[in-house]
């Protein structure tokens, strides 16, 4: 395998328009596009608001049906890549929405969303009375989301607590300062996160989650497949397509190189095995299987598969 390096550093930070923060805008744009579609798998009425105030980027094409139509006519392959991004995010979002619904039905009212980005579940899901949702992310990212939704009088459907801290820092202490109770079962979410952590940080993250989890807790995770030459080639093609989308939207420059923000570490810990070895009951579903079952099989090649959607429970 040809190795790749990351543009990240141990103490880097970002706002919503730069680095890892900009990837949250792309994900929100995909949710907005899915919500506007004829037969949406999800409903995120706040995604469009969050994208529109984030400035210009390749996401502007996803946020505009008119630009998408132009892209489809000028570059069908680029539009197909865009649609795959929308389909994947829709299926992933639906899976984790279901996770929270199941956790709520089990009586869990303490929720932690790690690297929350522009996640709007605190606002759009039907939470039981007494639910507290803790959102952990960079301070400027959380601030942008709060200011944007406050400006439109959008109110959360639960008690929402911001925890403005980097996950490479002492986030458990920050979480507890906001009222988190280690004695209560928790529903944890790590969605679209692990690829942006080096192996050691990923392992430490899960160790801390387990330390903070009372019996009855649940966790949902998106685990990424191993990096290889085929994935690197695919990312390069995607970036070229997004560059064309930017030009269509009247923007200069190149698209964000998402691959340069990731940590392409070999021998990452197998998340399902790791959790099972610590007493968690694990259900792991290949992402392509979940996509097929949702009627969104996509077009990715065999070598690009490998992402896994995971749900686990620590029995009481």
UniProtKB/Swiss-Prot annotation:
Transmembrane segments: none
Keywords for this protein: Methyltransferase, S-adenosyl-L-methionine, Transferase
Gene3D superfamilies according to UniProt: Vaccinia Virus protein VP39 (3.40.50.150)
One of the record's GO molecular function terms: methyltransferase activity
Domain of life: Bacteria
Enzyme class: transferase
Cystine residue pairs: none
Keyword Transport: no
EC number: 2.1.1.-
UniProt binding sites for S-adenosyl-L-methionine: 137, 166-167
GO terms of biological process kind: methylation
Stored PANTHER family: S-ADENOSYL-L-METHIONINE-DEPENDENT METHYLTRANSFERASE YKTD-RELATED, S-ADENOSYL-L-METHIONINE-DEPENDENT METHYLTRANSFERASES SUPERFAMILY PROTEIN
NCBIfam families: mthyl_TIGR00027 (TIGR00027)
Family: Belongs to the UPF0677 family.
Identification of the protein by name: Putative S-adenosyl-L-methionine-dependent methyltransferase MAB_4606c
Provenance organism: Mycobacteroides abscessus (strain ATCC 19977 / DSM 44196 / CCUG 20993 / CIP 104536 / JCM 13569 / NCTC 13031 / TMC 1543 / L948)
Biological classification of the source: Bacteria, Bacillati, Actinomycetota, Actinomycetes, Mycobacteriales
